[in-house]
């Protein structure tokens, strides 16, 4: 999180760095340093930092109360030390063609407990990354201001940036609303700006699944998958699912907005990520280490499991980002994100390919990848106008299980469309499945008895 940015670790080990503070400031620094150290050493860090979360209130009213952050020289030094250390680690471990690292951070605007967080990814190297300091929600809580800063830095440095919305399921309906965080209706300018900077969204992670909810997909038997009925705030508040929280609803809202303003602001590729805060890639169910590093210590697990609110053990073992890149390099992976040739899994390393086109036929399955690229577009692409025979588009789809995990149940296509009145709809189609099951009269498929 750019708002604290590893500064807590720097303070824990090296103290708050300030030049010549007066007596009162010195006492405050000493108190804060020791309070932080005591909380971490006693294992009560999560409880200590919970009081920093916002209180529950109307997000659009809360965001109006934002004021520019005051000058805090000691904290600024600690944060810059952390950024220097992080960029060095990323650069030292980047091995093009073998293992790719990125310079990035999280922008964590949470007005009134509404999660508007974005993950910022760049293709910067260490030298370029240290020429700027990450933009945080303390600089501005509005996504548009973040995008403006990214555009400015891109022009100054030549660095490519991506802004990836995440945990939209706890955004209190604002992440994919038809109005902006400032309360203005989405217009053409905003739609184009958002499309430019946010081609991809994170739809599954440790704090639940953001694809859809049974309130908005009542005919989908999988819409109850991995809910997270909590908000990121001080105090409790009953969870209320809102249309603007979920990605599948956002895709439909984008189609509706395109009819109104001429641009679809929510034409999104989808990825998963862990957000585990442990530094461990443990997204698989049998290899789950919890949300925080404290959860990874065996003797702490029973206490965490009994907590009333969200904890590392009320969360999901999820997820992974899969990217169809030409090579394992920063440039190639960023290119794949830009064209949305990405997908999400909840942890298993399932391999999925999808191509769409107007002239694809069943015979193209013989060389799915070559024919898919030659005669169609890959996942995340736009089909364009009908260039083939009468009828709709065709799709080539291939899914292969992770050899270390369960068998696959089925492949589905979820269709979203806008009718003549401008209203959107969705329909779920089962197109391939394991075993000798058959579709019923409503196109439904019985649950698989065993996926192992």
Model-derived features: where do they sit?
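Short loop/hinge segments at the start of secondary-structure elements
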Residues: 142-153, 170
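Substrate-binding clefts and substrate-entry loops adjacent to catalytic sites
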Residues: 128-130, 218
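An N-terminally biased module of ancient metal coordination in phosphate/nucleic-acid-related enzymes
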Residues: 1-103, 111-113, 128, 135-138, ...
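Short, contiguous clusters of charged residues that form electrostatic/catalytic patches at enzyme active sites
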Residues: 84, 144-148, 249-252
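Histidine-centered divalent-metal-coordination microenvironment in nucleic-acid enzymes
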Residues: 117-119
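C-terminal functional module detector
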Residues: 6-9, 72-75, 87-90, 105-115, ...
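Short connector loops/turns at beta-strand edges and beta->alpha or beta->beta junctions
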Residues: 125-126, 208
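Long, charge-dense tracts
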Residues: 121-123
